[in-house]
Amino acid sequence: MNRTLNREQVLALAEHIENAELQAHDIHKVTNDYPEMTFADAYTIQWEIRRRKEERGNKIVGLKMGLTSWAKMAQMGVETPIYGFLADYFSVPDGGVVDCSKLIHPKIEAEIAVVTKAPLVGPGCHIGDVIAAVDYVIPTVEVIDSRYENFKFDLISVVADNASSTRYITGGRMANLEDVDLRTLGVVMEKNGEVVELGAGAAVLGHPLSSVAMLANLLAERGEHIPAGTFIMTGGITAAVAVAPGDNITVRYQGLGSVSARFV
């Protein structure tokens, strides 16, 4: 993997980006100052942010995929999605409150998450491997919050920023894989009682489990894998919708109940 940043630059950028998250202030995208940065550099920064959180006592409780729409990938000129990690304090209970004072410019996406019962190891991981390894699925709403000004960034910058990860809400009911067709699963997103987005699971790479296979293969590039018992958000079924203090959101999942939260 081609890298252009030295260790000191990685450490400084990881601290800079994480401070923006923890202090809820926006920053210029990092490629403004480091235009030669590569994806390998960006993931090295992301893993350093992860290490900083673990050193501080936070637990890493899951993984997430981003850029999981074929159209969006074509628009960005890339061939694979991106991934990030989920820290323990990102979790919000169903019906709970999201404190916007700790965020910059939050948006929500409807997603399907899975929990694995067996490890998944790339390269060469495919959807059949994922089907055999998934324990159950659960409806999830992701709150994304880019640390970059005006939510404007390039792909390398967003990878370094942990794929804009900040909060997630799980709810509805868990289901076994054989009891639900994730490809045709319908989703309705409501904000303040009005429908704002509609979608189906096929929006995620044709099938949400394809996203999990890609995650295993991306992790393999760093010598990592997906352990058994991993919570994975597979990617946005709907477009991202901006939220602000005073907003109430509910996302309804066909046959799986709903997930809701209040923003203050």
Swiss-Prot record:
Keywords: Aromatic hydrocarbons catabolism, Lyase, Plasmid. The keyword Cytoplasm does not apply. GO terms for cellular component: cytoplasm. Gene3D superfamilies: Fumarylacetoacetase-like, C-terminal domain. Pathway: Xenobiotic degradation; toluene degradation. Its EC number is 4.1.1.77. GO terms for molecular function: 2-oxopent-4-enoate hydratase activity; 4-oxalocrotonate decarboxylase activity. It holds the Pfam family FAA_hydrolase. It catalyses: (3E)-2-oxohex-3-enedioate + H(+) = 2-oxopent-4-enoate + CO2. It comes from the Bacteria. InterPro entries: 4-oxalocrotonate_decarboxylase, Fumarylacetoacetase-like_C, Fumarylacetoacetase_C_sf, Hydratase-Decarb/MhpD_sf. Disulfide bonds: none annotated. GO terms for biological process: toluene catabolic process. Belongs to the hydratase/decarboxylase family. NCBIfam families: catechol_dmpH. This is 4-oxalocrotonate decarboxylase. It comes from Pseudomonas putida. The gene is xylI.
